[in-house]
């Protein structure tokens, strides 16, 4: 199954030519299962969703700017169900999750100076962060009698964080002569790893 918002498509013809706004989201779901036998069955599922927001201003003269914001999730999962007997069955699950957040902006300014020269300033920035998870889980359900129900299992999650990756660029020039062209990078752009165990 899939769906997408369409408010942006309806609003687009009514926006001014020099100013644009755009927002939409979508998500996609897919599921499939396979029966190997009366005791064994495999379930596969996948999900992808994204939100997008953008602005743009361009008056076809000396000033342009815009920004974008995107965030979304991707999840893939496989689960194997096995029945040992009428009292005991298990579920073994392997899943992957990816989340990404991104914000970017730009501007382009142009000015005419008094000495018949043109000053141009350009700026852009990009910010990203995200997380990846690998999850391994096994769960057992045991019914020794109609009056008792026992659940037990174990799990492991491998986390990989990508925090605060930031890049900014600034450039200035007069006519064709550049006197500033600088790129800044954030200091905290290394990945962080973590392990989580449960039982």
Where on the chain are the PLM-derived regions?
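Face-selective signature of the C-terminal outer-membrane beta-barrel domain
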Residues: 33-51, 70-199
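Periplasmic-side early beta-strands and strand-to-turn transitions of outer-membrane beta-barrels
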Residues: 1-71, 101, 105
